[in-house]
Amino acid sequence: MLRRFHLFALALMLFGAAGLSRHTFAQTTQPAQTAQPAVPTPTPELKVDKKVQPVTGKDAKTPTAEQVVETVIIVYGGGGGRDTLKQIRRNGVERGKVTRTANDGRVEELSYEQRFVRGETAGKDKIRVDQKMPTMEYALVFNEGRIWGIINGTAFTPKQDVTAEFLSQSQHGIDALLRYKENGSTVAFVGKEKLKGLDLWVIDLTDKDKSRTRYYISANPDIRKTARVLWLEYEETPPEASAPSKYRRTFHDYRYSQNTLVPFRSVLYRDDKQVQEARVQTVTYGIKMDESFFQNPEAAAN
């Protein structure tokens, strides 16, 4: 009930009373929720950055970049915005399956378990992704800027392409937009477009390494659909290539997990060819995390 009230209040700020008159905010059937072992955290009162107001009815056509992004942050925080995301998503565990298509057309499926602890910035995060394939199991660990792999309890240096893919997921992801201020990134409003019948805000994010990601965000006046990242695009030169490739990641099956918005399915395209599909099965935030998960076995032994 609290979340519905907060989102209704947000709708008033987003599009004004006139915009709401065209929509009926009746109770809607939500997608079936994946069973969550943790008790959902209550959504705090709606808080808005006083320096940057979210998009309102009067400026919905020509908002600033910060207005759009701050609106996205409010929506993904279930109405509580940045404070809710920091409180609930400070750590967690995500489990799911990934289907990959190799350059030679081979398709492989793996299951994964990702544990994370958020730092003040993305560079200070701790992330561990355990991956299980039919023929092997291994983990990749990011700990405050350092990356290594673990297989059978022994540390190893991942291949360059594996490291690049691992880093790209956080550098060019939704979290990079939600944490743009903490990471010292800049955002620019490209424009409002209509693509594939969708009203979109287009935002460019440039991080401190000058890497750019373009986000296509729903500008639908319906509060149940607005301010969601529908897809993003970026260019990157793979380690084995001499020219950059164009990547596009699309996001689907949005659900609320502990009062924060999560896409449970994403698809990655490289030069318009699908190379990866990820499906989240469960995600739980606010779990006490053992530091040993993020330690290098060799360093721990010494």
Please name every model-derived segment.
Residues 1-10, 21:
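Bacterial N-terminal signal peptides that target proteins for export
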Residues 15-25:
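C-terminal segment of classical bacterial N-terminal signal peptides
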Residues 27-48:
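N-terminal propeptides/low-complexity segments immediately following signal peptides
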Residues 41-43, 54-56, 60-68, 73-77, ...:
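Flexible, processing/modification-adjacent segments and terminal tails
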Residues 48-155, 184-194:
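N-terminal mature ectodomain segment of secretory-pathway/periplasmic proteins
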Residues 102-108, 135-140, 155-158, 210-214, ...:
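Short, surface-exposed beta-strand/loop "edge" segments at domain boundaries and coil↔beta transitions
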Residues 109-113, 140-144, 156-164, 216-217, ...:
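Short amphipathic beta-strand/extended segments with alternating polar/hydrophobic composition
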Residues 196-298:
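Gly/Pro-enriched, hydrophobic low-complexity segments
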